[in-house]
Amino acid sequence: MGDMQDHEKVLEIPDRDSEEELEHVIEQIAYRDLDIPVTEMQESEALPTEQTATDYIPTSTSTSHPSSSQVYVELQELMMDQRNQELQWVEAAHWIGLEENLREDGVWGRPHLSYLTFWSLLELQKVFSKGTFLLDLAETSLAGVANKLLDSFIYEDQIRPQDRDELLRALLLKRSHAEDLKDLEGVKPAVLTRSGAPSEPLLPHQPSLETKLYCAQAEGGSEEPSPSGILKIPPNSETTLVLVGRASFLVKPVLGFVRLKEAVPLEDLVLPEPVSFLLVLLGPEAPHIDYTQLGRAAATLMTERVFRVTASLAQSRGELLSSLDSFLDCSLVLPPTEAPSEKALLNLVPVQKELLRKRYLPRPAKPDPNLYEALDGGKEGPGDEDDPLRRTGRIFGGLIRDIRRRYPYYLSDITDALSPQVLAAVIFIYFAALSPAVTFGGLLGEKTRNLMGVSELLISTAVQGILFALLGAQPLLVLGFSGPLLVFEEAFYSFCESNNLEYIVGRAWIGFWLILLVVLVVAFEGSFLVQYISRYTQEIFSFLISLIFIYETFSKLIKIFQDYPLQESYAPVVMKPKPQGPVPNTALLSLVLMVGTFLLAMMLRKFKNSTYFPGKLRRVIGDFGVPISILIMVLVDTFIKNTYTQKLSVPDGLKVSNSSARGWVIHPLGLYNHFPKWMMFASVLPALLVFILIFLESQITTLIVSKPERKMIKGSGFHLDLLLVVGMGGVAALFGMPWLSATTVRSVTHANALTVMGKASGPGAAAQIQEVKEQRISGLLVSVLVGLSILMEPILSRIPLAVLFGIFLYMGITSLSGIQLFDRILLLFKPPKYHPDVPFVKRVKTWRMHLFTGIQIICLAVLWVVKSTPASLALPFVLILTVPLRRLLLPLIFRELELQCLDGDDAKVTFDEAEGLDEYDEVPMPV
């Protein structure tokens, strides 16, 4: 600990993920990205430093400019080859987002965030202020650059003329890289003498604390070294070469900063990438200067994107020095105290983000005159033309725009499917769509006495899915039955039973009204209303459905225990399709099957992102977790032959679930009794409620799938997709089949399965999205396979209902994962010191956060009461009332900043493997 008190460290956090998260927040407060054209860049404030005669002034604008390309920085140090006793430049470290150091055995250490010592930054500032700067140097070789730089050194009295030749030979020495060190006996820092022969340092070399830390970090805390990041460097990377060496005949440290006019490949560099910047740091051996750390400080500076932009555009030394000062202002100093815990260090990250926020804010600029035109409505914003929710003011204008935007890609929607990844996605999504279809089909049959069941749901999913894949604007959406629709079907069936109405005929009239409603909404471009549905309403909706799932699961289990109670003795049992009276072990086995299915599905879900087995195997097992769980528990039930369990009712072939009660075509005037005329017109009310549910799920799902972070290029169509989904549902009701909606989790899973990830831009960096296979074939094939599954009656009929209850419970529990409301409810029972470090905790007072949570809980309770009464049909209408509540009432109670933290969309699109995280955590919507 004593050594730590001799130095202060600077904590640098150039984390790409942190920067991206910060940019997302800063966009809300007029953040301007730094990757902008040169013409829009505001001139930096130059220090009042006069240009010297030797500053290389560019005669034309540099072609080097800030771009979105990745940066690669390489640090080479002058070393002594122990075997051949000759000097050479050795690659000591490189930066590809993160820092990677070369170990003594010639193997790269693990990538890590750069840390810098306080004195190294002070020394860097000192040498920068007296350095030589050559901007837009028109040289294409290392020798040419070295000659120009040494001439400038002499002109500015940085070095003596007699030192020129020695330094020139040194700069052009042989270069070695990681693979070359394996053939050497070792290297060590060397000091260049006047004769050109290396010498040992004049003073005994005692590694300083920062060098020890550097070596320890290079060796890594783990025994497993990192492979070289060379192959992971993206093409067209902006490359910087930093050279650090010791020369005993120099009087003082000298720095040369070179910006090439054209980025060109230089010989002897580890990569054939064009070099844009060259930094040379040379100086005499001194006990207070560690040139390795000085070089690391310079290299880290060149990886920082704000300084890199300035370095690309600077026209004078003053601008670079000003940017360096700004870099130092954003650096945190860790005082020499006792070693803190890791948790304490994490508290520094928000402080660093705040410093970065201020650094990224643009300087005040003159108002753009075009801004006033845009505010007056005279000119559209740059992205308005492509906004699918922008209203045109014409009848069916949005629908026509969707067709014109999306259908020109129709041919590519076919050709883009010629990829093995699409075939793999078809297999995966088939099981992801089949499992809930069978589960909801079985439960729907239970709720409606088999007036609709598995066969109707499978056929409806297949037919509507095929049509949507062929005609939809966003074919990556997966249509299916969902929890909210199941709740409505149960409520409407109860309503019809209590009023002596034919349920299946009433659905047909609802279908008529659905078609009329969707035509009117699409005609007047009503899809724009989805923008007013915030996370507040989505989470109440999702939480309610999750509670219903969980409640229904245990309600069904209790009913099984009531039908087959546990008794001390039983009469002899004759196994029949459905025995009458109590049966031994039926209730207990049903409990085991339900709990076993739930636990297996949860375990396999977590296993997907665990650290066991190779990643591909984990993902396969995790992605097929639900069907695997069903299969295992069906086998368990099959092997237990002497205990009865209620099975899924599936008709043989293309038959309706209850052929004695209905056929495939529903007569709108009534099947067995005359359907009352008043109900034909009154059906518009339940039709409106169904429309609200489908509108909410489908439009919000389209918003989530079409997020800009997913980098889809073909666009989407809210109006066209809504017309298809609701219209097909209305027609399906005439055939006694369920209406469907776009399902959020399944659609996000489909999009993820078709996303092609590029190689990571650097060691430790996250892989970037390369493209998304936007095509129609995967959805088409999945729908066909779901339709063919109706022929699997011998297999489906062996599934116990208790297994489906386990899947129902699984869907209810997992749906809570991405709901911030659930997290805030848990915080009600935690002391504030244990609250997480998230915006809605940090920026909002605890009691006001709990007040917001309480209001949501009250809304949730009201919805639950409505659902539990005969007025349960009105549930969607009561739900939609939370939208004006959020828009009109809550702003009177909470400040805008508080609402942004509590009701902001902070869900991120991520493809990184993180333990316990998947698609459920990304979407605050019901399954």
Curated annotation (Swiss-Prot):
Residues 445-452, 494-502, 559-586, 640-679 are extracellular. It is found in: Cell membrane; Basolateral cell membrane. Kidney. Glycans are attached at N658. A lipid is attached at C859 (S-palmitoyl cysteine). Its main location: membrane. It is a multi-pass membrane protein. SUPFAM superfamilies: Phoshotransferase/anion transport protein (SSF55804). Residues 1-420, 474-476, 524-535, 608-618, 701-716, 754-776, 817-854, 886-927 are cytoplasmic. Coiled coil: none annotated. The modification Phosphoserine is found at S18, S199, S222. GO terms for cellular component: ankyrin-1 complex; basolateral plasma membrane; cell surface; cortical cytoskeleton; cytoplasmic side of plasma membrane; intercalated disc; membrane; plasma membrane. Functions both as a transporter that mediates electroneutral anion exchange across the cell membrane and as a structural protein. Component of the ankyrin-1 complex of the erythrocyte membrane; required for normal flexibility and stability of the erythrocyte membrane and for normal erythrocyte shape via the interactions of its cytoplasmic domain with cytoskeletal proteins, glycolytic enzymes, and hemoglobin. Functions as a transporter that mediates the 1:1 exchange of inorganic anions across the erythrocyte membrane. A dimer in solution, but in its membrane environment, it exists primarily as a mixture of dimers and tetramers and spans the membrane asymmetrically. Component of the ankyrin-1 complex in the erythrocyte, composed of ANK1, RHCE, RHAG, SLC4A1, EPB42, GYPA, GYPB and AQP1. Interacts with STOM; this interaction positively regulates SLC4A1 activity. Interacts with GYPA; a GYPA monomer is bound at each end of the SLC4A1 dimer forming a heterotetramer. Three SLC4A1 dimers (Band 3-I, Band 3-II and Band 3-III) participates in the ankyrin-1 complex. This is Band 3 anion transport protein. The lineage of its organism: Eukaryota, Metazoa, Chordata, Craniata, Vertebrata. The gene is Slc4a1.
